[in-house]
């Protein structure tokens, strides 16, 4: 466990932060601050999809909104409750500022991921549409090297998300329900595994139906619950924002911050937790965006950016503000326990119940999203028939995860997750000219024609 933890530290402190932030800066400049120019278009398509007649997902793909809902299902997970709290506890309030920077730059990266996933999506002999980094990795690196790199990425994502990642998510639900309601973790594990398997075997249509229903409900529930706590402590809001901005550059100047926080700690923890949460550049969400039914790849690029904004600037931000306005950092707690404490300052024991319900929605939706990403790679490596075996194995991992000691599993998932960033981001760098061309084509030809 110590060795894997050390590998993760090296990856995040030196390699991934440079790759992901560097990629974000390159794509932001190359695409002319697309985060700002495409912001309105992204929200227009998102809300248009939310309130319009729902499309039916099938072998030809899913609607743009269903693809976003599946991506957000994966992005908004337990990290939004525990990850922000951990960053605050270790890096202090300034970590949130660096989360914002990482998310802003990440919006440009995920735009590139989504449009490449759309451009290189694959239609099988049976008419099923699939896609993801494996296809644009092969487009970026021709021949045997591209095939090997794509296969390595596939194996990493199947283990990181489909097996180990989902085990961690189910453990979060089981432990939260045990704390709040006293239900044995094995009982919770069986229930989650059965429900998950029911969704898995329903294929793309059932996954799309579940995510487009569950994501708006869970987002609204958490947003309202958080805003009530924040506004109950409204006098602390100005200082919370002050501590975030000042703490990013001078952590010692902020009272109520983390003991021993430095600028380096604030930056590394903020960037790492932010990127880990919104998944920009990780190569996970392109699987959902690839199967969206859109007229031009750039349209889904706009929608993908909205996902990062919702994950970080809304959900993660609310967790941070709840913790800061309730002055919970000096308690010495960390992770989900810190978030739980912050909510309980207003809700009492109801805070545990609130977090348990949110944990269920966030973690279960992530299980579905990550399964979907994993099965696309199982299909790529072993063919469509292997998906049935994978769905059963994934459900077994969901059950076992509810009982496991998760530190080792979490660290291994972290490690595989970190490693899969490298082939994905290198492929995006190699395809940066193509990304730029597709982007220019939309604004020059397609957008004017509409």
Language model region names:
Residues 19-26, 34-43, 153, 170-177, ...:
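Membrane-interface loop-to-helix entry segments
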Residues 33-62, 86-96, 108-144, 329-346, ...:
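Flexible loop linkers connecting adjacent transmembrane helices
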Residues 1-74, 78, 89-95, 106, ...:
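N-terminal alpha-helical transmembrane segments of multi-pass membrane transport
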Residues 1, 30-35, 79-84, 161-173, ...:
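Transmembrane helix-loop junctions in multi-pass membrane proteins
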Residues 105-113, 190-204, 215-235, 268, ...:
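Selective recognition of specific alpha-helical transmembrane segments in multi-pass small-molecule
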Residues 27-28, 102-127, 134, 138-171, ...:
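Helix-loop-helix module between adjacent transmembrane segments
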């Amino acid at each position: 466990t110590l060795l894997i933890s050390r590998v993760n530290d090296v990856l995040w402190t030196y390699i991934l932060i440079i790759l992901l932030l560097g990629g974000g800066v390159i794509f932001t400049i190359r695409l002319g601050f697309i985060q700002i120019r495409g912001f309105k278009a992204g929200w227009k398509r998102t809300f248009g999809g939310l309130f319009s007649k729902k499309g039916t997902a099938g072998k030809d793909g899913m609607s743009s909104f269903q693809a976003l809902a599946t991506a957000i299902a994966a992005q908004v997970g337990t990290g939004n409750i525990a990850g922000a709290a951990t960053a605050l506890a270790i890096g202090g309030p300034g970590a949130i500022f660096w989360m914002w920077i990482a998310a802003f730059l990440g919006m440009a990266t995920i735009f590139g991921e989504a449009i490449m996933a759309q451009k290189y999506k694959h239609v099988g002999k049976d008419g099923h549409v699939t896609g993801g980094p494996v296809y644009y990795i092969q487009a970026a690196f021709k021949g045997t090297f591209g095939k090997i790199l794509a296969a390595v990425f596939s194996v990493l994502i199947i283990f990181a998300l489909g097996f180990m990642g989902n085990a961690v998510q189910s453990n979060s639900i089981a432990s939260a329900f045990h704390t709040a309601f006293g239900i044995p973790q094995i009982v919770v594990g069986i229930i989650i595994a059965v429900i998950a398997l029911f969704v898995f075997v329903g294929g793309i249509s059932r996954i799309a139906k579940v995510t487009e229903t569950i994501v708006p409900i869970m987002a609204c529930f958490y947003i309202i619950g958080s805003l009530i706590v924040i506004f109950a402590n409204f006098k602390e809001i100005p200082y919370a924002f002050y501590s975030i901005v000042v703490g990013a550059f001078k952590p010692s100047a902020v009272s109520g911050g983390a003991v021993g926080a430095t600028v380096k700690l604030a930056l590394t923890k903020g960037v790492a937790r932010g990127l880990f949460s919104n998944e920009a550049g990780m190569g996970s969400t392109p699987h959902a965006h690839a199967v969206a039914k859109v007229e031009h790849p750039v349209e889904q690029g706009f929608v993908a950016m909205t996902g990062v904004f919702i994950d970080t600037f809304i959900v993660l931000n609310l967790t941070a503000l709840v913790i800061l306005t309730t002055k919970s950092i000096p308690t010495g707690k960390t992770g989900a326990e810190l978030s739980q404490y912050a909510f309980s300052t207003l809700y009492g024991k109801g805070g545990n119940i609130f977090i348990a319900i949110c944990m269920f929605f966030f973690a279960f939706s992530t299980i579905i999203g990550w399964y979907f990403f994993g099965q696309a790679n199982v299909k790529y490596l072993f063919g469509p028939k292997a998906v049935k075996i994978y769905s059963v194995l994934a459900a077994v991992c969901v059950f076992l995860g509810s009982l496991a000691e998760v530190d080792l599993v979490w660290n291994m998932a972290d490690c595989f997750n970190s490693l899969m960033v490298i082939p994905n981001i290198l492929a995006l760098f190699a395809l940066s000219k193509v990304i730029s061309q597709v982007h220019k084509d939309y604004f020059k030809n397609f957008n004017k024609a509409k």
